[in-house]
């Protein structure tokens, strides 16, 4: 909903996908920011699927509700990864929004219950490392069989937060 300097137009995205396919790239992970905010995300996703890419969606999950779920399911994403930055208050603080954890978890559950291959994504920092065991337990309780653990990426807001990266 907000144009960013240098952001590709949808036709440019399609041309880039053509190039990636010609180079033999097998997988596209659509991420952001928040990819579900892009007005053409479902057209882009459908186009990628029609080209034979393995297509993943990396989202914060808050927009996946009962109204959005059929659109997500119709694409047939090979994988939907939903970011959880901690348990409840930790996640809400990271996302700067009260209720973000509940909304993200709702997205996980809706995808799971619809038969969409869904996983939890967790970026480890000093500020959320204490929640890692509880998140792994949550994934088990929710019958989510994929848990993706990553380090802080020093790009965008992550670069501003580089001091909070986990150090062991």
Which residues fall in each region the model found?
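Conserved alpha-helical substructure of the radical SAM core
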Residues: 1-79
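Radical SAM enzyme [4Fe-4S]-AdoMet core and its adjacent flexible, acidic
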Residues: 3, 8, 54, 74-75, ...
């Amino acid at each position: 909903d907000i144009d960013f300097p240098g952001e590709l137009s949808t036709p440019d995205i399609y041309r880039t996908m053509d190039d990636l396919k010609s180079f033999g790239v097998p997988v596209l992970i659509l991420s952001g920011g928040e990819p579900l905010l892009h007005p053409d995300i479902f057209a882009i996703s459908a186009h990628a699927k029609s080209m034979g890419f393995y297509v993943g969606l990396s989202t914060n999950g808050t927009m996946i509700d009962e109204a959005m779920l059929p659109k997500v399911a119709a694409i047939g994403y090979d994988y939907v990864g939903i970011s959880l930055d901690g348990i409840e208050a930790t996640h809400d603080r990271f996302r700067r929004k009260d209720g973000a954890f509940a909304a993200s978890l709702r997205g996980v559950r809706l995808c799971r219950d619809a038969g969409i291959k869904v996983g939890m994504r967790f970026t480890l920092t000093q500020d959320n490392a204490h929640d890692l065991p509880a998140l792994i337990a949550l994934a088990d309780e929710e019958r989510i069989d994929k848990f993706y653990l990553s380090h802080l990426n020093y790009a965008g807001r992550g670069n501003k937060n580089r001091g909070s990266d986990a150090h062991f």
